[in-house]
Amino acid sequence: MHYVDGFVAAVPTANRDAYKKYSEGFAAIFKEAGVLHYVETWGVDVPEGKLTSFPMAVQCKPDETVVFSWMTWPSKEVRDAAWDQLMKDPRFDPAVTPMPFDGKRMIFGGFEVLVNR
């Protein structure tokens, strides 16, 4: 059964091009590791909520944009084995590949697919 990793982050709006380049590089790395599908999206209509929302969850500042991303793996087992190797990959070191956003405010998680049509 497919497995999905999902991410939400706040990226400085001025860093859109840098974020796209960064994401394209990571998409290639994840594809090497076995990801079936890698998607990065740039927030266009992401309203602030009263109780909770994407912007609130990542403490989005006025000069930032929310990004929503996910990748699909063949299975959780493939994903777990790949992440073990990816965490040792020097390309994941922020000193080697600096993040164009504040990674401390990124939220992420792994999900089993319930419906896929």
Task: Tell me what each language-model feature is.
Residues 1-25:
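Long, hydrophobic N-terminal alpha-helical segment
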Residues 4-11, 49-86:
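Short, well-ordered beta-strand segments in beta-rich or mixed alpha/beta enzyme
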Residues 5, 9, 21, 40, ...:
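Intrinsically disordered, low-complexity regions enriched in small/polar residues
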